[in-house]
């Protein structure tokens, strides 16, 4: 049985033109891509390896900078090896602390310098303790010298904490006594400084003063410390000491004092003498220190050989020293 023939469409639909170019594009898209050559693949792999190496180098360089800049990471750098995650965590904690404090100290060079100085001192203290433990052994833990040394270093480390505001013109507290501690030929100067309470007791065993009786001395400016030690520097130069002794020697005068117009130097000595008397650590007399008293004086109530009280000789030596130091 034959199937009935369907009616054909219009002539325009059957006789329409066929687009050959569109079929060519479809055939090209369906065609698989060509595989690259082996030389191109090797060049691409090499370029990718170079880029990856540069990226790792930048990461490692940034992490090393963070180890150096973050104080907590810098403190743990010598003891153990830090991982990258630990360095990043310490950096995050440090930035959080800076944000919590309002950013104070981030651009303060002095605060950062003092912080790194205290960190370095604590590292050295740890090494000293470890060295003493290895050298002396566990049996030397009851040694009094070792105990005194460690307690002194611990107290010094506690005092080295950075202060919020600078106390002087210098970035670090001045400690000018190291020159005098290294000079064994100056026992009189060390005794005078110990009497005045300006030398720590671990340096001078014979002094029973506390370790640091004057806390403000550690942060004293260099100008004040230099002014303190200038008068005692006369002991180092024997020629100047002899000249001061000759100046302090009483002059021969007649028994009846002749009225003389007061000179400018006498006026200065009259103004300076009460100040020196009030600021002197010890009363004038035979118990004074040898650096300032050139001639032993008798009782202050008895007149001197030239008809003057004995205290005038001491004031004269003080004034001569001060005027000579001012000229020096």
Curated annotation (Swiss-Prot):
SUPFAM superfamilies: HLH, helix-loop-helix DNA-binding domain, Orange domain-like. GO terms for cellular component: chromatin; cytoplasm; nucleoplasm; nucleus. Residues 42-111 are annotated as: Transcriptional repression and interaction with NCOR1 and SIN3A. Disulfide bonds: none annotated. Residues 116-153 form the Orange domain. Its main location: nucleus. Residues 43-98 form the bHLH domain. Residues 24-42 have a biased composition (Polar residues). It is found in: Nucleus. Belongs to the HEY family. Self-associates. Interacts with GATA4, GATA6, HES1, HEY1 and HEY2. Interacts with HDAC1, NCOR1 and SIN3A. Downstream effector of Notch signaling which may be required for cardiovascular development. Transcriptional repressor which binds preferentially to the canonical E box sequence 5'-CACGTG-3'. Represses transcription by the cardiac transcriptional activators GATA4 and GATA6. This is Hairy/enhancer-of-split related with YRPW motif-like protein. It comes from Homo sapiens. The lineage of its organism: Eukaryota, Metazoa, Chordata, Craniata, Vertebrata.
């Amino acid at each position: 049985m034959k199937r009935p023939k369907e009616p054909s469409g219009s002539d325009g639909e059957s006789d329409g033109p066929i687009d050959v170019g569109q079929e060519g594009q479809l055939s090209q898209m369906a065609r698989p891509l060509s595989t690259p050559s082996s030389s191109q693949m090797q060049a691409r792999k090499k370029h990718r390896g170079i880029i990856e190496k540069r990226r790792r180098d930048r990461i490692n360089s940034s992490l090393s900078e963070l180890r150096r800049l973050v104080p907590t990471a810098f403190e743990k750098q010598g003891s153990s090896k830090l991982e990258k995650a630990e360095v990043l965590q310490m950096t995050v904690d440090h930035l959080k602390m800076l944000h919590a404090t309002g950013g104070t100290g981030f651009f303060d060079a002095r605060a950062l310098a003092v912080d790194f100085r205290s960190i370095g001192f604590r590292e050295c203290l740890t090494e000293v303790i470890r060295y003493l433990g290895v050298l002396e052994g566990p049996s030397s833990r009851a040694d009094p010298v070792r105990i005194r040394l460690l307690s002194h270093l611990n107290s010094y480390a506690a005092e080295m904490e950075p202060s919020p505001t600078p106390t002087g013109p210098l970035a670090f507290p001045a400690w000018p006594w190291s020159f005098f501690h290294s000079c064994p030929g100056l026992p009189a100067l060390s005794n005078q400084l110990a009497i005045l309470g300006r030398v720590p007791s671990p340096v001078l065993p014979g002094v029973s003063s506390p370790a640091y009786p004057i806390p403000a001395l550690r942060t004293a400016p260099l100008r004040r410390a230099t002014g303190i030690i200038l008068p005692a520097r006369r002991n180092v130069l024997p020629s100047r000491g002899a000249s001061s002794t000759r100046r302090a020697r009483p002059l021969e005068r007649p028994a009846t004092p002749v009225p003389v117009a007061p000179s400018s130097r006498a006026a200065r000595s009259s103004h300076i003498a009460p100040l020196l008397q009030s600021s002197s650590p010890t009363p004038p007399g035979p118990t004074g220190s040898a650096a300032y008293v050139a001639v032993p004086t008798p009782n202050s109530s008895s007149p001197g050989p030239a008809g003057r009280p004995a205290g005038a000789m001491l004031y004269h030596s003080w004034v001569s020293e001060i005027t000579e130091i001012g000229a020096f």
